[in-house]
Curated annotation (Swiss-Prot):
Compartments (UniProt record): Membrane
Organism domain of life: Eukaryota
Tissue: Mainly expressed in leaves and, at low levels, in roots, fruits and stems.
EC numbers: 1.14.14.-
Keyword Cell cycle: no
Protein name: Cytochrome P450 CYP94D109
Binding site for heme: C437
Alphabetized GO MF terms: heme binding; iron ion binding; monooxygenase activity; oxidoreductase activity, acting on paired donors, with incorporation or reduction of molecular oxygen
Membrane spanning residue stretches: 3-23
Organism: Paris polyphylla (Daiswa polyphylla)
Family note: Belongs to the cytochrome P450 family.
Length: 502
C-alpha cells in the first residue's frame, strides 16, 4: 500500500512537467532513440521517451529532475532517504482529502502510522483475508455476476465489476465493513446508495485534489467557494461524514467488546487499540487505506485480463497451472483456493508481474529535496528541487529487461519454471526502501485468487474489437483503461480437463 503514497503528487507533477515541456522546443540527444509506440498514454510515453533518450536515463527540466536510472532511484528511496521526503509543498493541496494520513505525511507522524499498520500485514492476517474475505466475495458475488453475464450474453465492463470487488475488499480489511457493492445485480447506484455516494464523492475529491496543482489560484477559489472548489466542498462533506461514521461505529463496537482490539481483524480497530487517537486522526486512517485499495488491484486486474484475453498461449498456460495445482492438492472439486495453492502458481505470478512491469499502477513517483545532493549518475540536485522517477519508463528499458522489453513475455520472470523476483530498485512498482509497500504480498495473493477463480471457470473475450495498439489508458489517480474493459463472458463447467481449453 505504501507504493501509493505519492499517487496524487506523481500525477500532477507529470502534468505540470509535460505542459511546461510542450511549451518549449526540446532537442533530444542524438544517441539512443527508444522504440516506444504511440498511443496508450501520450503523457507517459512522452516522459518515457525523454528519460530513455538520455545516456544516463535522467533528464533535468524546468520543473525538476526525472529519472529511470536504478542507481538514482536506490539513492533517493534508500541510501539518502532522509533527504527526500514528500515535503509540505507537495502535500498541502492534498490535505483536505488525505489530512495527515500515512500517504500524506513525513517524519514521526508517518513512522507511527507505518509501525501500527505493519502489525496488520502478517501471515495470519493475509491467510484470513485471502481464504475468508476475498474467497467469499469471489465465490458468492464475483462468479455469480459473471455467470449471469454469460447466461444473458450481455457485454459487461469488467473494469467496473473489478472496481466494486476491490471496494468491498478494502472496506473489509480497513474497517471491517461490507458495502456489498458487487452484490448489486444491475450495478446501479441509486440516490440512497450510501456506499455508492461515498465512492462517487471520493473519486470527485481525489480528481479535484490533483487538479489543484495545475491551478495557481485554487486557494482563492476555495475561499470564495467557486468552480470545482465548490464541488470539492460538497464531495468532502460526503467523504468526511462517511469516514467519521465509520470511526464512530468502530468505537461503539469496541466499547461494547471492552478494551483491546476485540474480535475485528481490521486496520481501524488496530489503530484504536494501539493509542488514544483523535477522531480526526482516525478519519485520516480510513481515507488513506480506502485510497490504497480502492482502484489499485482492480485496475491491475483489468490490464491483466486485457492482456491474457488477447494471448491464447498465455491463457492456456495459466489454466494448465491451475489444473496442476489442484491435482497436487487432491482438489478436484474446484471452489476457493487455499493460500498454499495460490503460492504455488508461479506462472500466474509471472503474468501479473509482467502486467505491472508494462502497466505500473503508479507510473511515476516524486520526492522533495531538503539539501543539495549529487545523484550516482552525477546529476546535481538543488535544495527544494523535485525528483521524479518513472516506473513506466523503467519497464521499457533494454538494459534491465533485454531487447524484447516492449513484448509481454511472462517467461522473463521464471527460472526453471520458478518465479524469480527482481530487485525492487529495478522493479519499484511497490516502491523500495523504508517506504516499501506493506501490502505487497496481500495484493499479489488477492489478485491471484481473483484471476485463478475467474480463469478456471470462464473465458473472457474483449468485446469492443479494438486492436491492442488502439487501446488507450490514462491517469485518474491510478493508471486506468480508457472506456473500461467491455468483455463477453463464456462459462464452462469445471473438470480436470476443461480448464485447459481456451
Amino acid at each position: 500500500m505504501e507504493s501509493l503514497s505519492l499517487i496524487f503528487i506523481s500525477f500532477i507533477t507529470l502534468i505540470v512537467f509535460l505542459v511546461v515541456s510542450a511549451s518549449k522546443k526540446r532537442s533530444h540527444p542524438s544517441g539512443y532513440e527508444p522504440d516506444i509506440p504511440k498511443g496508450g498514454c501520450p503523457m507517459l510515453d512522452s516522459t518515457a521517451y525523454l528519460v530513455l533518450s538520455s545516456p544516463t536515463n535522467t533528464a533535468v527540466t524546468s520543473t525538476g529532475i526525472i529519472t529511470s536510472n536504478p542507481e538514482n532511484i536506490e539513492h533517493v528511496l534508500k541510501t539518502n532517504f532522509a533527504n527526500y521526503p514528500k515535503g509540505e509543498h507537495l502535500t498541502y493541496g492534498l490535505y483536505d482529502l488525505l489530512g495527515r494520513g500515512i500517504f500524506n505525511s513525513d517524519g514521526d507522524h508517518w513512522k507511527l502510522q507505518r509501525k501500527i499498520a505493519s502489525l496488520e500485514f502478517n501471515t495470519r492476517t493475509i491467510r484470513h483475508f485471502v481464504t475468508h474475505d476475498v474467497s467469499r466475495e469471489v465465490l458468492d458475488r464475483l462468479l455469480p455476476s459473471l455467470s449471469r453475464a454469460a447466461n444473458s450474453g450481455e457485454i459487461i465492463d469488467l473494469q467496473e465489476v473489478l472496481d466494486r470487488l476491490a471496494f468491498d475488499n478494502v472496506c473489509k480489511i480497513a474497517f471491517d465493513d461490507d458495502p456489498a457493492r458487487l452484490a448489486d445485480k444491475k450495478f446501479n447506484d441509486g440516490e440512497n446508495d450510501y456506499y455508492g455516494k461515498f465512492a462517487k464523492a471520493f473519486g470527485e475529491a481525489a480528481e479535484i485534489s490533483t487538479q489543484r496543482f495545475e491551478k495557481s489560484r485554487w486557494k482563492i477559489a476555495r475561499a470564495l467557494n467557486l468552480g470545482t472548489e465548490r464541488k470539492m466542498k460538497n464531495a468532502l462533506a460526503i467523504v468526511n461524514e462517511f469516514a467519521m461514521q465509520v470511526v464512530r461505529e468502530m468505537k461503539r463496537k469496541r466499547a461494547e467488546e471492552g478494551k483491546g482490539r476485540g474480535s475485528s481483524a481490521d486496520l481501524l480497530s488496530l489503530f484504536i487499540s494501539e493509542g488514544e487517537f483523535s477522531d480526526e486522526f482516525l478519519r485520516d486512517v480510513v481515507i488513506s487505506f480506502v485510497l490504497a485499495g480502492r482502484d489499485t488491484t482492480s485496475s491491475t486486474m483489468a490490464f491483466f485480463f486485457w492482456q491474457v484475453s488477447t494471448r491464447p498461449s498465455i491463457c492456456q498456460k495459466i489454466k494448465e497451472e491451475i489444473v496442476s495445482v489442484r491435482k497436487n492438492h487432491n482438489n478436484s472439486q474446484g471452489g476457493a483456493f487455499t493460500l498454499e495453492e495460490l503460492r504455488e502458481m508461479d506462472y500466474l505470478h509471472a503474468v501479473l508481474s509482467e502486467t505491472l512491469r508494462l502497466y505500473p499502477i503508479v507510473p511515476l513517483h516524486a520526492r522533495y529535496t531538503l539539501a543539495d545532493d549529487v545523484l550516482p549518475d552525477g546529476t546535481m540536485v538543488k535544495k527544494g528541487s523535485t525528483v521524479m522517477h518513472s516506473i513506466y519508463a523503467m519497464g521499457r528499458m533494454e538494459s534491465i529487461w533485454g531487447a524484447d522489453c516492449l513484448e509481454f513475455r511472462p517467461e522473463r520472470w521464471l527460472e526453471n519454471g520458478v518465479f524469480r523476483p527482481k530487485s525492487p530498485f529495478l522493479f519499484p512498482v511497490f516502491l523500495a526502501g523504508p517506504r516499501m509497500c506493506l501490502g505487497k504480498e496481500t495484493a499479489y495473493m488477492q489478485m491471484k485468487a481473483v484471476a485463478a477463480s475467474v480463469m478456471e471457470k470462464f473465458k473472457i473475450e474483449v468485446a469492443d474489437g479494438k486492436h491492442e495498439s488502439e487501446r488507450e489508458y490514462y491517469l485518474e489517480i491510478v493508471l486506468r483503461l480508457k472506456g473500461g474493459l467491455p468483455v463477453r463472458v463464456t462459462e464452462k463447467e469445471w473438470s480436470d480437463n476443461s480448464a485447459v481449453n481456451v
